[in-house]
C-alpha cells in the first residue's frame, strides 16, 4: 500500500489535475520543478538531469528543475517544440506563511500565445487559429496575440477545401483551437499534418451559450459593422480561450479585419510554395525568395507587414497607384529617404512591447526600448510633413508623437535599468521623493557601516575586525580566534568558524532593521510605481498600436524604394484593359544571385486580343520555367505597389495566380506524382477566371506519352474555349504547336538556340515560333552522363527519328497531307482513322505498353535496344 503523499505533493497533484495537457512548472523556492511524466519529457527535451524526490510514495518521484530566473529560455524551447507550459507560482511570501505556501497557475504559454521577445520570430507573425464550424459555413479566425491583430474568414462552401487551405498557408498558424464539439474532417487533418510541423491542436470547453459568446465579442471589439452572428461567436470563442490561457487583460487585441477576397490577389498554397515568395523550396528559409530580395526593412513591424503584402497583393488600381506614388517619391527624394530610414533604424518592436504592457509581462528594458522609439517620432513627422504623396501624408496623420507617454518614460525609467524589476534601480532618481529618501538611506548605510567599523577599531584596538552580511543572521563583526579575548562585553557571539568568531551588537542590529526595512520598502515602492506606469501606458495602447502600424507601412514603402533605386527598377503603368505588356523583364531573384552571368531579359506580352495563351516549347534547361515564374513574380511585385525589373511595363491586375510547376509524390496521402499533378490541374480549371494568370509547366509528363499528350491538349483547349485566362503553358509535347492554327489567341513561343555541330548554346531568349526537338542528349552531356551512354543514345535517337519520318510520310499520304500528331477540332482521333493500323504491329504494341516514367535511364535504353532488335528480326533495317 502506497504511503500518503506529502502536503506539497498533494497540492501539486491537485493543480496538475486541472492542467493535464500542459507541462506544469511548479515553483519551489528559486526553482521551477517538474514531476512524473512532465519531468521525463522536460529532461529529454531540455537535456537536463532527471532526479527523484521523496514525496510519500515508496519509490522516489521522477523530478527535474530549472532556475526560475533562467526559466524563460527553457520554456521557449519547449513551446517551440509544440508543448504547452503552465506556470505555477507561489502566491504568498514563504517567510510569512506557516505550512504550505499557496500556489496556482498564473498563465499558460502555448505555441500560439507566446508573448516574450525571444519566444517569437521578430520578423514574422505568430498566428493562433480558431476553426469554428456551423451548419452552412466554416469560420476561421487568425490572431497574433503579440501584436493584437485578428483576421476572420467565413467560408460558405464547406466542401470546398481550397479556400481553407489557402488561408492556412498564408497565415501558417502555430496552434489551432477547436471549440468543444468541433470535429475536423480527415482531409483537413491530413493537410495540417503535412504542411505544418509541431503544430498544436487544442480543443477547449466553455460553459457559455452561443449568445453569451457572441455578446462577449461585441463588448470587447465594439462596432465592427454588419457581420453574421456566427462570426461574432467565433471571435468570442477566441477571446474566451485567450483569457483562460493568458489570465490577464487582453484589450490590446483590437485590430480586427476580414480576410479580403474581392480586392486582393489570391495566391494559393501551390503558388506561394513554387514561386518561393516568402519561403524557399530547399529548406523553408527566406534565402533566395522574393522576400529576400525586397526586404530591406529596418523594423520588425515593417518586416512582418512586407511579408503580408507579398502573400496578399492588391487588385484595386487606386490602392496600387497610391503605393506606387509613395515609392516613387521616396526614390526621387533620396535625402529624405535616407533620413527617414536612419530614424526608423532607432525604432524597436513597440507593437509587441505594448502587447506585453497589457498582459503584464513587459520588462524594464522593453520600456526603455519604447521610450527610445517614441523619441524619434517628432523627427519622422517633420520629414513626412514635406512629402506630397497620399500614402505618405496619410501615414503622417496616423503617427502620433505620444509626447505625454514619452515624457513620462523619460522621467520615470532609469537610463540603463536592470533586466528585471526585482533587481531594483528601474525607476529613475528624482521621479518619486519617497523612493529617493529610501534610496538615500540605503546608499548612506554603507558609509555609516564603514564609520561604525572604524570607531570599533579605534575603541578596541582590533585593527583586523571587519563587517559582513549573510541571510542567516544578517550583519556581523568578524574577529580572528587570536583576538577574540579582546572583544568588548557588549559583543554577542553568533557563530564560530574554523579561524574566526562572528559577533553582533545592539547598535548593529538596530542598523540592520532600519536598512533591511528600507530595502524592502524600495522594492515594494518601485513595484507600485512600475505598475502605475504600466497602467498609464495601457490607456493609450490603441493609439500607440496605430502609430506602430503606420510606421510599419512607412518602413515597407522605404524598403521598396531603396531596392527600386539600387536595382534600377521601373514603375509599371497600371491599366484596366486586361493587358500585360512587360518589355525586357528580368527575374529579380535570379538576377540578384547571378555571380558570373548577366541575366537575359525577355518580353512578356499577354492580352485578351491575340496573345491570351502562350504555348512555350523548347529545350530543357533553356529557361522556360524561369520565364514563366518571372511573369508571376513581376505581377506580384507590381500588385504590392513595388517597382519591377524591366525596361517598361503596363500591367492590368489579375485576380489570382495559379501555378503548376515541378512534380513530386505526396507520400503522406499515398498519392503518386501524376495524381498530385492532375488534382492541381483540376483545381486550376475549376477556380481560374478570365482575369487570372495561369502558369502550367509540363502537364502530362507523369504518365504514358499518348495519355500525357491527350491530357495536355485537352487542358489547352479547355482554357482557350472556356476560361480565357492569361496563360503561360510550357510543354515538351511539340505536337501541340499545331493548335495555333485552331485558336486565334494561342501563340507559339520557344527558346532561342544556337547550334554549331554538336555544340548547342541556349540563348535564354523567348521568341515566337515552336520547337521541334528538346536537345535532351545535349542536356545529358552537360549533366555529365558517360560518353558511352551518350553515343548509344544518339544512335537510338537517329533510329527513332527515321521511324518517325516514315510514319509521318505515311500519315501525309493517308490524311492528304494533314498532320494527325495533334487532333484538331475537325479531325478524328488517331484510333478512328486508317492511321490506327500502324499501331497493330507487335513492336509498336510493346512500345505502347512501356511505362517510361517508371524506368531508370539505363532501363529505358536497354528496353529501346530490345525493341530495336525485335524490329530488325521482323524485317526492319
Where do the language-model regions lie?
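Extended, charged coiled-coil "arm/hinge" scaffolds of SMC/Rad50-like chromosome-maintenance ATPases
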Residues: 497, 501-535
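Charged catalytic and DNA/RNA-contacting regions of genome-maintenance
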Residues: 1-329, 345-358, 362-454, 581, ...
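Active-site phosphate-binding and catalytic loops of NTP-dependent enzymes
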Residues: 88, 111-120, 249, 388-391, ...
Amino acid at each position: 500500500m502506497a504511503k500518503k503523499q506529502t502536503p506539497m505533493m498533494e497540492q501539486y497533484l491537485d493543480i496538475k489535475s486541472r492542467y493535464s495537457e500542459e507541462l506544469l512548472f511548479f515553483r519551489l523556492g528559486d526553482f521551477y520543478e517538474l514531476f512524473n511524466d512532465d519531468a521525463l519529457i522536460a529532461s529529454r527535451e531540455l537535456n537536463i538531469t532527471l532526479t527523484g524526490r521523496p514525496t510519500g510514495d515508496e519509490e522516489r518521484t521522477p523530478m527535474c528543475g530549472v532556475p526560475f530566473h533562467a526559466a524563460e529560455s527553457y520554456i521557449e524551447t519547449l513551446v517551440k517544440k509544440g508543448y504547452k507550459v503552465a506556470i505555477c507560482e507561489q502566491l504568498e511570501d514563504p517567510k510569512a506563511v506557516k505550512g504550505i505556501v499557496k500556489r496556482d497557475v498564473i498563465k499558460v504559454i502555448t505555441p500560439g500565445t507566446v508573448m516574450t521577445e525571444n519566444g517569437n520570430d521578430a520578423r514574422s507573425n505568430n498566428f493562433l487559429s480558431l476553426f469554428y464550424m456551423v451548419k452552412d459555413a466554416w469560420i476561421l479566425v487568425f490572431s497574433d496575440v503579440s501584436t493584437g491583430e485578428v483576421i476572420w474568414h467565413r467560408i460558405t462552401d464547406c466542401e470546398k477545401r481550397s479556400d481553407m487551405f489557402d488561408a492556412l498557408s498564408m497565415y501558417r498558424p502555430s496552434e489551432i483551437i477547436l471549440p468543444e464539439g468541433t470535429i475536423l474532417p480527415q482531409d483537413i487533418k491530413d493537410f495540417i499534418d503535412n504542411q505544418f510541423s509541431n503544430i498544436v491542436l487544442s480543443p477547449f470547453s466553455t460553459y457559455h451559450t452561443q449568445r453569451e459568446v457572441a455578446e462577449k465579442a461585441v463588448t470587447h471589439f465594439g462596432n465592427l459593422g454588419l457581420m453574421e452572428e456566427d462570426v461574432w461567436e467565433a471571435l468570442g470563442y477566441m477571446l474566451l480561450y485567450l483569457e483562460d490561457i493568458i489570465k490577464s487583460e487582453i484589450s490590446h487585441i483590437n485590430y480586427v479585419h476580414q480576410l479580403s477576397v474581392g480586392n486582393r490577389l489570391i495566391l494559393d498554397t501551390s503558388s506561394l510554395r513554387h514561386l518561393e515568395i516568402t519561403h524557399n523550396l530547399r529548406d523553408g528559409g527566406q534565402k533566395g525568395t522574393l522576400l529576400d530580395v525586397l526586404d530591406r526593412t529596418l523594423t520588425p513591424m515593417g518586416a512582418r507587414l512586407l511579408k503580408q503584402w507579398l502573400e496578399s497583393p492588391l487588385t484595386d488600381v487606386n490602392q496600387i497607384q497610391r503605393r506606387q506614388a509613395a515609392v516613387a517619391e521616396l526614390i526621387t527624394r533620396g535625402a529624405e529617404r535616407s533620413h527617414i530610414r536612419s530614424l526608423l533604424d532607432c525604432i524597436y518592436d513597440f507593437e509587441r512591447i505594448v502587447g506585453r504592457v497589457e498582459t503584464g509581462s513587459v520588462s524594464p528594458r522593453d520600456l526603455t526600448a519604447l521610450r527610445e522609439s517614441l523619441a524619434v517620432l517628432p523627427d519622422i513627422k517633420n520629414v513626412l510633413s514635406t512629402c506630397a504623396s497620399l500614402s505618405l501624408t496619410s501615414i503622417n496623420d496616423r503617427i502620433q508623437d505620444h509626447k505625454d507617454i514619452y515624457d513620462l518614460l523619460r522621467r520615470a525609467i532609469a537610463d540603463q535599468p536592470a533586466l528585471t524589476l526585482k533587481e531594483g534601480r528601474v525607476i529613475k532618481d528624482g521621479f518619486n521623493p519617497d523612493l529617493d529618501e529610501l534610496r538615500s538611506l540605503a546608499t548612506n548605510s554603507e558609509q555609516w557601516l564603514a564609520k561604525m567599523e572604524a570607531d570599533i577599531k579605534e575603541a578596541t584596538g582590533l585593527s583586523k575586525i571587519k563587517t559582513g552580511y549573510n541571510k542567516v543572521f544578517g550583519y556581523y563583526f568578524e574577529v580572528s580566534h587570536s583576538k577574540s579575548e579582546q572583544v568588548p562585553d557588549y559583543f554577542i557571539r553568533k557563530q564560530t568558524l574554523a579561524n574566526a568568531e562572528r559577533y553582533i551588537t545592539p547598535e548593529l542590529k538596530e542598523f540592520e532593521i532600519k536598512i533591511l526595512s528600507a530595502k524592502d520598502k524600495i522594492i515594494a515602492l518601485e513595484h507600485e510605481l512600475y505598475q502605475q506606469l504600466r497602467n498609464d501606458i495601457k490607456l493609450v495602447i490603441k493609439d500607440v498600436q496605430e502609430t506602430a502600424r503606420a510606421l510599419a507601412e512607412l518602413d515597407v514603402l522605404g524598403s521598396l524604394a531603396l531596392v527600386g533605386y539600387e536595382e534600377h527598377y521601373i514603375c509599371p503603368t497600371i491599366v484596366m484593359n486586361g493587358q500585360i505588356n512587360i518589355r525586357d523583364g528580368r527575374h529579380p531573384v535570379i538576377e540578384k544571385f547571378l555571380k558570373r552571368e548577366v541575366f537575359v531579359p525577355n518580353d512578356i506580352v499577354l492580352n485578351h486580343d491575340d496573345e491570351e495563351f502562350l504555348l512555350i516549347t523548347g529545350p530543357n534547361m533553356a529557361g522556360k520555367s524561369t520565364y514563366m515564374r518571372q511573369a508571376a513574380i513581376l505581377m506580384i511585385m507590381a500588385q504590392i505597389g513595388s517597382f519591377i525589373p524591366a525596361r517598361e511595363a503596363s500591367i492590368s491586375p489579375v485576380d489570382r495566380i495559379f501555378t503548376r510547376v515541378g512534380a513530386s509524390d505526396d507520400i503522406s496521402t499515398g498519392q503518386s506524382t501524376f495524381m498530385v499533378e492532375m488534382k492541381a490541374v483540376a483545381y486550376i480549371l475549376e477556380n481560374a477566371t478570365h482575369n487570372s494568370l495561369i502558369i502550367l509547366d509540363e502537364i502530362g509528363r507523369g504518365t504514358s506519352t499518348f495519355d500525357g499528350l491527350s491530357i495536355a491538349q485537352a487542358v489547352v483547349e479547355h482554357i482557350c474555349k472556356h476560361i480565357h485566362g492569361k496563360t503561360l503553358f510550357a510543354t515538351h509535347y511539340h505536337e501541340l504547336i499545331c493548335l495555333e492554327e485552331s485558336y486565334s489567341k494561342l501563340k507559339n513561343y520557344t527558346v532561342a538556340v544556337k547550334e554549331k555541330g554538336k555544340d548547342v548554346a541556349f540563348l535564354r531568349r523567348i521568341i515566337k515560333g515552336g520547337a521541334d526537338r528538346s536537345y535532351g542528349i545535349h542536356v545529358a552531356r552537360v549533366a555529365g552522363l558517360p560518353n558511352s551512354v551518350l553515343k548509344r543514345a544518339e544512335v537510338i535517337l537517329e533510329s527513332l527519328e527515321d521511324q518517325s519520318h516514315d510514319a509521318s510520310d505515311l500519315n501525309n499520304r493517308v490524311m492528304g497531307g494533314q498532320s494527325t500528331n495533334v487532333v484538331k477540332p475537325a479531325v478524328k482521333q488517331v484510333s478512328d482513322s486508317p492511321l490506327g493500323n500502324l499501331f497493330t504491329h507487335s513492336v509498336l504494341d510493346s512500345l505502347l505498353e512501356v511505362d517510361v516514367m517508371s524506368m531508370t535511364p539505363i532501363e529505358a535504353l536497354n528496353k529501346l535496344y530490345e525493341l530495336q532488335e525485335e524490329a530488325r528480326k521482323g524485317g526492319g533495317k
